[in-house]
Amino acid sequence: MGHQVLGLGIAGWSAARLLRAQGKEVWVWDEQDSELLRQRQAELEREGIPVHLGQPFQLLPGVKQVVVSPGIAWDHPLLQEARRQGIEVVGEAELAWPFLEHLPWVGITGTNGKSTTTALVAEMFKVAGLEGIPCGNIGLPLSQVALETWQGRRQPAWIVAELSSYQLEASRHLMQSSPGSPPRIGVWTTFTPDHLERHGTLERYAGFKARLLQRAQWRVVNGEDPYLFRRRQDWENTYWVSLQDPQADVFLRGSTLYIQGEAVAELEDFAERCPGSHNLQNLLLAAAAAHLAGIPNTAIQGAIRSFAGMPHRLERVAQIQVGSTPIRFVNDSKATNYEAGWVALNALSPPIILIAGGRAKQGDPSAWLRLIQAKVARVLLIGEAAPALAQALQEIRYTDLEILPTLDVAVERAFVAACSLAQALDNPAQPITVLLSPACASFDQYSSFEHRGHHFRACCQALVGSLEC
C-alpha cells in the first residue's frame, strides 16, 4: 500500500520526499513534461521514488492515499474516483501538518497582499531574533519545512504560512484541529472575486478563506476592505487595521503607525520603497500579527526599516535615461487578476505604458478599465486574453492600444513608445513608467507568474545592455 503524489511542482516534489523519508512507498505523477520536471524526476528517482511524466493521471494499484499539489483541482475526476474507492485524498499542506502542529502558526490568506504580508511578518520575527519561516504558498513548501523540522535541520520558533484558497480547500483536517491548536493567528488581507473558475461561487471561495480565521485563536482583518470590515465582528479576538480610522487596533495618523494607541514607527521611507496604499495595508496587517505574537515594537520598527519589498510586486527592474526623462521598468507580474492590476495602477503616477494580458480570470474589469483610461498613455496586450481585453478597452473608447505576440516584443515596443512620449512631456524630468501588470494568469505562455516576471526582467536588462553597447 503506497502514496501517490499528483503534480511535480515544488510542493509535490517536497511532499514525495517527506513521505519517502518516513520509509513509505511513493509514486509521483504529472501530466506535463519539461526539462525542469525531468530534473526533478531524476532527483526523486535517485531517492527511490518512481515518477511518471507526460501521461494522463491514473490511479495506481495499491494506493491508500493520494496527495494533491495546490495546482490540481480538488474536484478532478481522478480524485473523485479515488474517493469513490475509499482512498484518502489530502493536500500537500495537510500532509505536513502532523510534523508542525506543535509549533505556533501565523496563517495568512486573502485575494491579494498575502505574500507581502507574509514576508513582512517573517521579517519582524527575524529582527526580534526568532525564526519565523515564511512558507506555504511563498518560499518553502510546508512539506519541505516539515521534513527539515522532523530531521532536526530546522528548529523554527513559529511558522509564518501564506495559505491560498487552493491549500485551504485541500486541508480540511488541518482546519478542523482541536481548539487552541495552531494557527495561533489568522490574517485575512483582502477579499475580491478570484479563482471562480475553480471554486464556482464567491460564497465557496469566501468559505475556504474563512476556515483559517474560524480555527485561529486571534484574527486580524483589513478594515479597508468593505467585505472584511463587515465581517470583523463575526469572530471573537479580532484585530482590525485601518489607514485612517483611529478606532482600529492598528492605524495610521499621517505617516505614523499606531498599535493599540501607541505611536510605533514613521513610514515615509517605507512608502517610498513600497509604493501604494495596498502596501501600507499589508504593513498594518503584519504589524498587528507581530504584536499579537509578542514581537516588541522595536523589532517591528527595525523590520519596517529593513524590508526591501517583494519580487514581481511593483519591483523596479531597470531604468533608462532618455535625455532628461527617466524611463522606469516595473515588474508587477504577481498581478494575476483585475483587482491587483487596479492596485498597481493606483500606486503609480502617470504617465504609464502598460503591458497586460495572459490567461483571463473571471471577474469584473470595469474599475481596472476606468483607471487605465485615466492614467495610462498606451496599452500593449499579450497572451490569450489580448483580443477580449482590446475589445473591452475599445468599448470604453480607449484606442491607444496594440496586440503583440510576445513579452519580448512588448518590452521593445514599450520603450519606443516611452521615447516618443518623453519628447512630448511638458516637464522633461517627469519619469515614465513601463509597467508589466498583466491582470491575468500566466499559464498561457509561462509556468508561473514568477517565470513571467523573470522573463520581463531579463528583457528589460537585455534592452539596457543593448543601449550601452
Curated annotation (Swiss-Prot):
GO terms for cellular component: cytoplasm. ATP binds at residues 110-116. Pathway: Cell wall biogenesis; peptidoglycan biosynthesis. GO terms for molecular function: ATP binding; UDP-N-acetylmuramoylalanine-D-glutamate ligase activity. Gene3D superfamilies: Mur ligase, C-terminal domain, Mur-like, catalytic domain, NAD(P)-binding Rossmann-like Domain. Pfam families: Mur_ligase_M (PF08245), MurD-like_N (PF21799). Its main location: cytoplasm. It is found in: Cytoplasm. GO terms for biological process: cell division; cell wall organization; peptidoglycan biosynthetic process; regulation of cell shape. It catalyses: UDP-N-acetyl-alpha-D-muramoyl-L-alanine + D-glutamate + ATP = UDP-N-acetyl-alpha-D-muramoyl-L-alanyl-D-glutamate + ADP + phosphate + H(+). SUPFAM superfamilies: MurCD N-terminal domain, MurD-like peptide ligases, catalytic domain, MurD-like peptide ligases, peptide-binding domain. Its EC number is 6.3.2.9. Keywords: ATP-binding, Cell cycle, Cell division, Cell shape, Cell wall biogenesis/degradation, Cytoplasm, Ligase, Nucleotide-binding, Peptidoglycan synthesis. Transmembrane segments: none annotated. InterPro entries: Mur-like_cat_sf, Mur_ligase_C_dom_sf, Mur_ligase_cen, MurD. It is an enzyme of class 6 (ligase). Cell wall formation. Catalyzes the addition of glutamate to the nucleotide precursor UDP-N-acetylmuramoyl-L-alanine (UMA). HAMAP family: MurD (MF_00639). Belongs to the MurCDEF family. This is UDP-N-acetylmuramoylalanine--D-glutamate ligase. It comes from Synechococcus sp. (strain JA-3-3Ab) (Cyanobacteria bacterium Yellowstone A-Prime). The lineage of its organism: Bacteria, Bacillati, Cyanobacteriota, Cyanophyceae, Synechococcales.
